[in-house]
Each structure stands twice: as C-alpha cells, then as structure tokens.
C-alpha cells in the first residue's frame, strides 16, 4: 500500500514525497533504499514502523555507499530510518555478505545498470535464497537489463536501460 501511494504521488505530481513511510514492508525498505539512492536530485526520508526500525539494513547501506551513495542513518547506526540524497552512482566492485538477505543482492542488481561504471558484486559466503537472485536476474533480463552470474560474482554493465517491452502484464 505504501509503495502504491508513493507511485501514485509520482504519477500525479511528478515528484516523490519528502517522507516515505513503508510501514512494516521489509522488501520495500530494501528495494527503495537502493532506488532512491540511485535517483538523481531526490531527497527522501525513508522510514517505517517501529519494528522496521529494529531491522538491520547496514550491509546494504554500506554496499550502496561503496557505489557512491549519500545515505545517513537518522537514528541508530545500521537501522532505518534513513536520509537519502539520490544521485547517479559511480558503480564499481563491491563485496556483500551473501548469507544475510537475497533482497540486498536484488536491490543492488536492480540499480546496477544505472551507475556510471556498472557493478561487479562479489558475494561472500553461502548464498541465501539463490532462487530469488536468479528470479531477479531473469526479471531484469525481461525488461532489457542483462546480468552475468559466474561463481561468486555477479556483473551488470553500465548503460543498459529498462524497457517496457516485456512479457509481464500488471
């Protein structure tokens, strides 16, 4: 519901609200953190329920910072809420613990093609929920963005663009 409201705001007014409250939606917190960080000229306070503010997001924020993101913890280090100043990210090579959450990996992959250099993501440790990462890569491909997963590394080249020509109907 929170994402729907945010998207409706974008559609109606052309800009996101200054405060985005995702409630208890953990997936939305992870994906929107990456999306907002990679959206130039966007300043957002991303928050959620009291319980959401107890759920760690530090590994994702650190990975995004390595790509050049401007993200500040508004309360407690490693946890939402977040102050995000979006910009085009530099990209590059980053390492991420693979046993935390496949959603961190998916969030990074989905914004990787928008970076200046692309992203080479080195997964460290046993991969959590590999089928979800594979699903992310397949959906990205359906929308025109290719990722290559070889061993513990996933690469996404810069300059690829998501397209509307895909087999999905919403």
Enumerate the predicted regions with their spans.
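Structural preference for solvent-exposed beta-strand-turn elements
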Residues: 1-170
């Amino acid at each position: 519901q929170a994402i729907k409201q945010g998207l409706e705001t974008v559609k109606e007014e052309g800009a996101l609200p200054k405060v985005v409250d995702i409630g208890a939606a953990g997936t939305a917190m992870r994906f929107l953190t990456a999306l907002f960080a990679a959206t130039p000229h966007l300043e957002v306070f991303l928050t959620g329920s009291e319980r959401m503010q107890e759920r760690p997001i530090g590994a994702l924020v650190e990975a995004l910072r390595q790509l050049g993101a401007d993200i500040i913890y508004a309360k407690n280090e490693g946890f939402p809420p977040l102050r995000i100043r979006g910009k085009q990210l530099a990209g590059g090579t980053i390492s991420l613990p693979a046993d935390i959450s496949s959603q961190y990996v998916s969030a990074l992959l989905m914004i990787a093609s928008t970076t200046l250099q692309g992203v080479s993501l080195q997964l460290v440790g046993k991969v959590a929920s590999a089928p979800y990462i594979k699903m992310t890569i397949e959906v990205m491909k359906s929308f025109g963005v290719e990722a290559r997963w070889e061993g513990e590394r996933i690469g996404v080249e810069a300059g690829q663009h998501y397209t509307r020509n895909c087999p999905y109907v919403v």
